[in-house]
Every structure is written in C-alpha cells, then in structure tokens.
C-alpha cells in the first residue's frame, strides 16, 4: 500500500509527544505522501519547525500572518490541498478550540476551513483527558464528524500512570490509510472474515493444528475495513498485529469457530471463510497429560462441524466465499466444494506452487465461480485481498 498522490496535513500542538510526529512525517513521505505540517507556537518549544521542513520538503507553518511565504491565502490553500488532516498530539487546549470553532492560529483556522476527513489524537495528562469538560469537547468533535483516535495507557511524561499517551506510529498511520488510501466502495456492507488456524486439544498440553498464520484472512479483513465495510474478524490463535475492525472475535477450536460464525451469519451480507479450520478433532480430551510409554499411541478422531456445509444451503441472499487449499486436483476439488456447499465463490490455491504456501506474504490463487475459473498471477496477499473484494463486489451487483 502507498499514499502516492495524497496530501497529509499534520497538525502538531504543544504536548510532550510532539517530537514523535517527526517519525510519522518521515514514514508518510516513505509511503509516497505529500506531507504538510502546521505547528502551534507551543509545539515549537518541544520540536523545531526545521525538523519537519527537512523531513517533508515544505515550509512548516506556524504564524498565520507569515509574510515569508508564497502569495496565497494560506489557511484556505492548505485546507483545500489536504486529503486528510491529523492533529496529533492534540492537547486539551486545541481540542477545546476545534470543538467550539475558535480559529485564532494557523492550525485551528485550517481545521475550521477544511472539508477533508479530520483525525484527532488526544494526548495529555490523565486528569486533563478524563476531565468532563475535555470529554464533552471530544464528544462534540465526534458529533461534527471528526474521527477521534483513542489514547493509549501507560506511564506518562509526568510519571502518572493512566490514559493519555499518543498512540504508536503504526496506529496513526493505519487511521490515515483508513481515511484516504482506498475508495469506500464497501460502505454499508457487513462482512465477516475468518482467519488463522484452529487448535483441537488432545490433553492439557497438546493440540492438533495446522500451519496457517492467518495472514490471508487478516489481509481481507484489513482491506474490507479500509474500503468502508463493517467487519467482523473471527480468528484462531495468530502472532499477527491486531486489525482494527468493528468486532474482533478470538476463538481456538473448530466448534468455537462454528458457533461464532453461525450465530452472526443472519446479520451479515458477506462471509469470507479464509480460516484453516480443522476437519477432525480428538474424540476424547484427556484430563491429564498423556505420558510417554513404550509402543505406539493411537488417537481416535471425529469430524468437526462443517461450517460452510451448514450455512450454505440456508443462506438468504448472503454472499459466501470459501477457500480451498489443495496439493492436487485443485480445480476439480474446488469446483466440487463450490457446488456441494452452495457457495458463490471459492478462492483456491495449491500448496505446492511457489509463493502460495503458509506463512509467506504472497499468494497465487484461482477464483472458482459458477462462471468458471480465473487464475491470478503471483501477488502480495494485500493485493489478493483487494482482488477478492473486487470480485465479490462485482458479483453482488
């Protein structure tokens, strides 16, 4: 993903976290964004404008009446140029001004004039943040369409422990991506995505599982959320960074996955079953650790619930997309799955094809639909995710 052709305006106010915004500005430039920065006068006490000028290649604006600038009505030109505004750190003072339409410096004037998406990241002492006045002002910003990024908790600069920390750089970047990186062509759709492996316990120590990392399912959930959908992510244990979705549902077993999906299915418009759900589980789970003994150990297994096999015949207009990982006869097996489970689409791949296995950041997939098969080239899983959503959107119309 990149931000080429997009202008991101950073508004930096006078909090101790102001210095952290240098890394954000640098990261945005590396992603191809055109970055403009406006600082309040108090912010210049924590980090100098020249730092941002060096990182962005633009003059850092502070003074509303700066004469050493090209002849334009600056607060209007910047407001029109920006595709998104991020005010971070947003102090209690700046939040109060924005909430009440006060425009007494360059930053608040531009924010008031701008019509683009506006993101606000409060960062301050816990007592200031939790003060009812500040909370009312934050609620006012949300009422007027601002997106408020929740503060993180931890040890603050004042040594207090509590909420009020500026979120990490990747969180701020994620909010920017959500605002402008992709068209909101999935707005209004409720999409459930499953991801990752399941774990079927054998005893208190061991379980049966597979090699799935959840990368493909997480990529679909992330892309759907960025494109405006209300996303429910139902996932097995993974080591991946959490995805910001409408509802996050962690599970462990296939039975838990079955219950999580079936209980929500009636409310969904689309289900993308990207999880690698176990087909079998131990028929009995030992209460204590199974001890090593001479000779072999035989484990009786039983079938787990067939999620798509259950909901496919019962669907009422929902779009069902299954996944099929094969090692041979991929097209035949995946086509049979499409028909047997009453699916609208199957995303098939062959584990033996280079770049299509577990744990990698790429995939080689074939879309199986009632119209036939369409093979895609080697792509990143992020690009595959968008291709899947494009196909779903096209076929729902």
Feature roles, as predicted:
Residues 1-119, 125-397:
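A cross-family phosphate/adenosyl-ligand binding-site feature
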